[in-house]
Amino acid sequence: VLSAADKANVKAAWGKVGGQAGAHGAEALERMFLGFPTTKTYFPHFNLSHGSDQVKAHGQKVADALTKAVGHLDDLPGALSALSDLHAHKLRVDPVNFKLLSHCLLVTLAAHHPDDFNPSVHASLDKFLANVSTVLTSKYR
């Protein structure tokens, strides 16, 4: 459960991402594909090379979903229900991949916003991404 301080940290941190959210999402995906090559199996039809339009487009989808989640911190299950259905029933993504992408998102955010990425913000973002991952995998059971 996110505390009031966590919610404030998440909103402030994501607000600073601003118009770079899609680029950060794409960079996090690239980091995931490089660091955890087995994750590429879910994207056999994508050009996974650096800067590809398909990775950029999916990075924007990731960013849009996180932006929606940040706007609905008190109802993540409601806000992400359709996305949870998609990943569980149609795409059948291994739940561990959400944790891997979350890690890569944290690294990307820390790299681009080092002055704002203090231990408190790091912990809040980690909790937020863990909650998002839990919601996205909730319909697997």
Curated annotation (Swiss-Prot):
The keyword Heme applies. The modification Phosphoserine is found at S3, S49, S102, S124, S138. The modification N6-acetyllysine is found at K16. InterPro entries: Globin, Globin-like_sf, Globin/Proto, Hemoglobin_a-typ, Hemoglobin_oxygen_transport, Hemoglobin_pi. The modification N6-succinyllysine is found at K7, K11, K16, K40. Gene3D superfamilies: Globins. Heterotetramer of two alpha chains and two beta chains. This is Hemoglobin subunit alpha. It comes from Sus scrofa. The lineage of its organism: Eukaryota, Metazoa, Chordata, Craniata, Vertebrata.
